[in-house]
């Protein structure tokens, strides 16, 4: 009996010890490291890892999803007013010309806007679990997601 208790206690100690030293898994949820994101715009190639040490708001949007488009506009205006926040907006429209027109019409900051389609869009949707809707992720200076679809007040409090 003592041997069985010792084995169970040793196993429990081993599990607790190993879990204490594991890094957080990368996943698109609060408390997890944000999945990396590689984006291109013209000759410019950007990665989410390039923004380590900064607070970043990643917005996924489309012209067909009104809520995501409204959020993109709000977050873009917020980032324009506060230098402590970096905004990366990723658009999934199938028509890149439409994307360009919306950026102009909505007076969005073009340098923070990226258009993706095809396989690249499918991979991003998979990595960020966007199969049930487009979301925004507030990422802290350590690359950890601190909020999903935050309101402006939440973003301001995180800065």
Region annotations inferred by a language model:
Residues 100, 104-141:
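Short, internal strand/loop/helix patches
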Residues 46-70, 75:
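Short active-site neighborhood of thiol/selenol oxidoreductases, capturing the structured segment around
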Residues 67-106, 120-125:
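Structural microenvironment flanking redox-active thiols in thiol-disulfide oxidoreductases
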Residues 132-159:
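Thiol-/selenol-based redox modules, centered on thioredoxin-like
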Residues 57-58, 87, 136:
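Hydrophobic beta-strand anchors of alpha/beta hydrolase catalytic cores
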Residues 1-27:
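Bacterial Sec-dependent N-terminal signal peptides
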Residues 22-48, 158:
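N-terminal "domain-start" segment that seeds a small globular fold
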Residues 60-62, 90-93, 116:
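Active-site-proximal beta-strand/loop segments in catalytic clefts of secreted hydrolases
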